[in-house]
Amino acid sequence: DEKLPVELQGKTAINLSRQAYLDYQKIFNGERFAALKAHGAKGQYLLWASTGVKNKNYSDVMYIEELIGEETINTVPDATLDAFRDHGVAASRLTNGIQNASVILAQVEANGINLHELGEKLQKDGLQQFVEAFDKLLDLVK
């Protein structure tokens, strides 16, 4: 975020999520899935995993509030859940400004951020964190 102009800071993850939600809607609200649904197929939900805020300059409920939307699930750290219970607002915001998501992401890339590389790194790091958490859980039950 530090590489970005102030007006773009804190917007990358939210707009990547909005773009993912648009892609999700195209798949599960499209003709191809409608045919499957007619035969009993159930849609999936999008999972936003561990959406705690690490930057102290942002609201501690920024991600949980911005990612509330239909057919989504959000897992959050305990501290984020406590903060949301205390002062969060439960309202669907995921689709707010969703049509501008691609524009904002293009601006992010124009400022030197390679979103594909960033996504690969975040997926790798996130997967490693889940592996470590799972291993700790297994150690507890051994």
Question: What role is predicted for each listed range?
Answer:
Residues 89-142:
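Active-site or pore-adjacent capping/gating segments
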Residues 1-79:
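Catalytic alpha/beta core domains of metabolic enzymes, predominantly
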